Amino acid sequence: MSLGKAETLSLLERQQLIDRAVRGAVEHAYHHAPAVREKMDRVGVSPSDIQTARDLEKLPVTTKDELVSLQKANPPFGGFVTIPVSKLRKICTSPGPIFEPEAGDPLERAAVVVKGLAAAGFTAGDIIL
């Protein structure tokens, strides 16, 4: 598998790509996940305050205990899902219990893993344990 465009960017270009993705993800979460909006509003952080990956440290941390409480108060995801529940492919539960929604295409996730392995220098015939 050949490397994608992102894997061949300069460090500056890659950081700019990451920063754009971070801005987009935070903006989307703020406008579509009530729990994210509430947590950000509570600490006075708006999406415009998050311009780079380094700015993520401004966001409040959600502890496991807080997540469990939020999921009990607003089942099953505690206000953290940003897409319609009908678009979820599966829901995993972990001990705790914590519900983890999954929406993406498993083949797209596999392609990301393959690209990572290619970037690390693995090729056809290599054995990975």
Regions found by a protein language model. Give the residues of each.
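Nucleotide 5′-phosphate-binding alpha/beta core
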Residues: 1-125
